[in-house]
Amino acid sequence: LLGDDEKYKIKGIVDRIDHDGKGNWEIHDYKTGKRALSQKAADKDHQLALYQIGLMSEVENIKSVKLVWHFIQHGIKVESKRTNEDIRKVINETKNSIDEIRGKLSNGGEFPPKKSILCNWCYYWEECPTQYGSNPYIQS
């Protein structure tokens, strides 16, 4: 949930979460694409920040959360952290995006799915109108 509002639910799959038992957490994401994020881009990226929001809603007594991207092809790691203000901003921006999409759909606008190579890494084939059955590229 984004905040306490039931109408803003997000579903995602985290690659890895670590903790030291003392309230310090790390959220890891493994990227296989050609391009690595710059530090500036990582500091603005929403994906792992949304995972952090999910973690914060499920776990008490969190002291710190480090966001870590592993770029496999380049052998590099990029780390970032979010302040409470950053988290509030991500929540608000994400809610606004959801509201925009809902508004467009309720006014007869379309939001057509687009098939691409990225579909091979998607866990939502069974819910997608462009795919059939479960994703054969992903093992459960």
Predicted regions and their residues:
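RecB-family 4Fe-4S metal-dependent nuclease core
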Residues: 1-140
